């Protein structure tokens, strides 16, 4: 039996047990919490159709309504997210670093919900989180700042030093402002009236 198949069988069984353990939380909070996530293969991060097919298989294989399938927030992942949400599959979007990609992912969630509702689906049973990474941005930016600091004047050095460790939080604040704008829109309020859950922002390290 291929190693990949063995891994998936073990992962599915493990996730089923975790989902069962948390299902009382899921029931008590009416689907607002109590989820377990299982990710599609990272090798499919640039493959829209492959991501959709694997997410569908994992969703069916686990067979628990408190599962979220992890899908990376790549350009190819965005249409997969839209398609999967429109099919009633809850999604945990991972590896979000930029405001632009976050905005695209949030739009994919909303348009997927609209399609699901238009087909007669109940949006209350769909949940999603957007995992927006913080510290990794500062690591990358601070390294670039260090390179610049080594080659500028003393006055400029002080200015650049003051920027270290701050870019990621500023980036996250702007993403949150976009989130607030979207959930305050008439478009979103129409979905809320039908019971839709917001796509929660998850601040990741």
Where are the language model's segments positioned?
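Short, well-ordered coil/turn segments that N-cap beta-strands
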Residues: 30-36, 63-67, 87-89, 124-128, ...
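Active-site beta->alpha loop and helix N-cap motifs at the rims of alpha/beta catalytic domains
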Residues: 1-80
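Glycine-enriched alpha-helix->loop->beta-strand junction motifs that scaffold or abut catalytic
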Residues: 80-91
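Catalytic alpha/beta core domains of metabolic enzymes, predominantly
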Residues: 90-205
């Amino acid at each position: 039996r291929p190693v990949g198949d063995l891994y998936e069988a073990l992962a599915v069984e493990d996730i089923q047990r975790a989902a069962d353990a948390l299902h009382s939380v899921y029931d008590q909070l009416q689907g607002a919490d109590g989820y377990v996530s299982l990710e599609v293969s990272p090798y499919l991060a640039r493959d829209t159709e492959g991501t959709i097919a694997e997410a569908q298989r994992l969703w069916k294989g686990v067979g628990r309504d408190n599962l979220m399938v992890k899908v990376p927030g790549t350009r190819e992942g965005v249409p997969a997210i839209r398609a999967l949400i429109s099919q009633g599959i809850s999604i945990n979007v991972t590896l979000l670093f930029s405001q632009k990609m976050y905005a695209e992912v949030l739009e994919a969630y909303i348009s997927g919900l609209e399609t699901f509702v238009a087909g007669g689906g109940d949006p209350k049973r769909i949940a999603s989180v957007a995992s927006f990474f913080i510290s990794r941005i500062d690591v990358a930016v601070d390294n670039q700042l260090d390179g610049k600091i080594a080659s500028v004047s003393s006055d400029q050095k002080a200015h650049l030093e003051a920027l270290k460790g701050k870019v990621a939080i500023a980036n996250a604040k702007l993403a949150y402002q976009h989130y607030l704008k979207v959930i305050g829109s008439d478009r979103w309020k129409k979905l809320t009236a039908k019971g839709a859950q917001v796509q929660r922002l998850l601040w990741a390290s």
